[in-house]
């Protein structure tokens, strides 16, 4: 099994030195991700593409899914490589492979060639296409908009028949740009803005300001872990949680109602700047979009930026909500975001849309900044991979089992895509599919006389959700420790 990975076009037009560096980093990223899943995967860098090989055909679908989510890959070709002796031999190999596929279809042949041969790419296309047309009676040649395009790459004495072409997410490889710190709230905007910086080549660390207790923190951890696992697992990143309840309480008590929103955001960027300085991070990322809420006017954004000691990046600044939600659906964070409450917007009943610097400074003069300093000093710093380990400690009262009792129902909390791909089947027990992001709103409607065993692929989400349900008074939950294949 072989894949030919093509780099993002913006990489290819850079100078030779920069292109080599980017390609080298992308090769390393691909290797880091694929070899966690398949240790025998080989990743080799060439001048204008990266070659991925695996002997384990059963891993094909998973390798394709992983490659589709690695930043820096424009597209990749799934190919079958064979040696050949001459042009007629290429035709014979192609005929044997595509004869069944071309029955009753229109087709054309496209050839890309490298090395010294007695024929050109166009001559190869004509010869192979003509031969296929003669030998497959029900097939017809059509050069424009054919049903099937037969793609062949020829390099020296080997031909590669392209079996499929898969799109990547493009962008730059992670590590080609500097690190950033994303202020993640668990909503639509912060998840998408984090992804956009990942796609642009930055390693994204996450800073979360907890305004809503344990349940809020668990939800945000789910989103950060989801984004990291899907799009940036080639790199270690940090998750920083800062308890901001004291800061919010001080603002509610001391600050004029209309100025609360801007003051809260200024406190957040101050705290984030201190965290960024600690790790030599030059920029913080927010999900703000111009005019979306009252604090996001140009005047207010400028005043918020003045409180920051780091560059503030706003990748969504010109996006509307529909675009942001559509992007959230693409990256798989929309359902998590739907279940997330928005705390920042509710602390001020009549927020100002055009804050005045002097008034903001006056209001902040009433604020006890020792509370902010204390919140930053007591922040929790995690390697994002520790979310799973932390869950082990936090969910000590939730039993993990591998054998089911009679009165237990399996609650498959994976996403619909995962359950469609690899459904959980049981001949002896009822299986209910309820994605983890719907548990908070729908678990209570289940028959509470039964016991529920939560299942997910790696056990992280099931444990986080078990903790959430326990926090909310549900004692009839356990975690299924067994994996399905």
From Swiss-Prot:
Please, one GO biological process term?
Answer: thiamine diphosphate biosynthetic process
Catalytic positions? 456
> Which reaction(s) does the protein catalyse, per the Swiss-Prot or TrEMBL entry?
[ThiI sulfur-carrier protein]-S-sulfanyl-L-cysteine + a uridine in tRNA + 2 reduced [2Fe-2S]-[ferredoxin] + ATP + H(+) = [ThiI sulfur-carrier protein]-L-cysteine + a 4-thiouridine in tRNA + 2 oxidized [2Fe-2S]-[ferredoxin] + AMP + diphosphate; [ThiS sulfur-carrier protein]-C-terminal Gly-Gly-AMP + S-sulfanyl-L-cysteinyl-[cysteine desulfurase] + AH2 = [ThiS sulfur-carrier protein]-C-terminal-Gly-aminoethanethioate + L-cysteinyl-[cysteine desulfurase] + A + AMP + 2 H(+)
Q: Which cysteines are joined by disulfide bonds?
A: 344-456
Sorted UniProt keywords: ATP-binding, Cytoplasm, Disulfide bond, Nucleotide-binding, Redox-active center, RNA-binding, Thiamine biosynthesis, Transferase, tRNA-binding
> Which positions bind ATP?
183-184, 265, 287, 296
Protein task: Catalyzes the ATP-dependent transfer of a sulfur to tRNA to produce 4-thiouridine in position 8 of tRNAs, which functions as a near-UV photosensor. Also catalyzes the transfer of sulfur to the sulfur carrier protein ThiS, forming ThiS-thiocarboxylate. This is a step in the synthesis of thiazole, in the thiamine biosynthesis pathway. The sulfur is donated as persulfide by IscS.
Write out the similarity annotation.
Answer: Belongs to the ThiI family.
Q: What is this protein called?
A: tRNA sulfurtransferase
Q: Which organism is it from?
A: Haemophilus influenzae (strain PittEE)
Name of the gene encoding the protein in the UniProt record: thiI
């Amino acid at each position: 099994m072989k894949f030919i990975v093509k780099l993002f076009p913006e990489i290819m037009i850079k100078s030779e030195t920069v292109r080599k560096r980017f390609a080298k980093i992308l090769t390393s990223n691909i290797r880091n991700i694929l070899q966690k899943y398949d240790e025998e995967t080989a990743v080799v860098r060439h001048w204008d593409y990266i070659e991925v090989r695996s002997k384990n055909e059963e891993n094909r679908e998973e390798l394709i899914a992983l490659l589709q989510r690695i930043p820096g890959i424009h597209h990749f070709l799934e190919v079958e490589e064979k040696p050949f002796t001459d042009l007629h031999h290429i035709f014979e190999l192609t005929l044997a492979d595509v004869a069944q596929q071309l029955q009753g279809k229109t087709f054309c042949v496209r050839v890309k060639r490298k090395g010294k041969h007695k024929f050109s790419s166009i001559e190869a296309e004509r010869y192979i296409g003509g031969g296929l047309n003669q030998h497959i009676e029900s097939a017809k040649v059509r050069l424009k908009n054919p049903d099937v395009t037969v793609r062949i790459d020829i390099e020296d004495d080997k031909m590669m028949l392209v079996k499929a072409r898969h799109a990547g997410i493009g962008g730059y490889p992670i590590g080609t740009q500097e690190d950033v710190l994303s202020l993640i709230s668990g909503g639509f905007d912060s998840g998408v803005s984090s992804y956009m910086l990942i796609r642009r080549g930055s390693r994204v660390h996450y800073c979360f300001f907890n305004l809503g207790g344990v349940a809020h923190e668990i939800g945000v951890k789910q989103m950060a872990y989801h984004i990291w696992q899907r799009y940036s697992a080639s790199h270690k990143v940090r998750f920083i949680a800062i308890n901001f309840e004291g800061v919010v309480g001080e603002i509610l008590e001391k600050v004029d109602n209309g100025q609360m929103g801007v003051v809260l955001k200024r406190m957040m960027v101050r705290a984030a700047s201190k965290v960024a300085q600690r790790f030599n991070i030059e920029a913080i990322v927010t999900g703000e979009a111009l005019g979306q809420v009252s604090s996001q006017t140009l005047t207010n954004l400028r005043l918020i930026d003045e409180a920051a000691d780091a560059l503030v990046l706003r990748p969504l600044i010109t996006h509307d909500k529909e675009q942001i939600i559509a992007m959230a659906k693409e990256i798989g964070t929309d359902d998590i975001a739907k279940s997330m409450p928005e705390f920042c917007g509710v602390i001020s009943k009549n927020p100002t849309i055009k804050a005045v610097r002097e008034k903001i400074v006056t209001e902040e003069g009433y604020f006890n900044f020792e509370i902010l300093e204390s919140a930053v000093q007591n922040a929790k710093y995690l390697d994002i991979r520790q979310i799973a380990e932390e869950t082990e400690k936090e969910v000590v009262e939730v039993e993990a089992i591998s054998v089911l009792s009679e009165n237990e129902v399996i609650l498959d909390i994976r996403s619909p895509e995962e359950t469609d791909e690899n459904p959980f089947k049981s001949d002896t027990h009822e299986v209910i599919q309820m994605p983890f992001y719907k548990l908070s709103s729908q678990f209570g409607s289940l028959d509470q006389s039964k016991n529920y065993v939560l299942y997910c692929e790696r056990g992280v989400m099931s444990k986080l959700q078990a903790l959430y349900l326990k926090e909310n008074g549900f004692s009839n939950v356990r975690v299924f420790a067994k994996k399905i294949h």
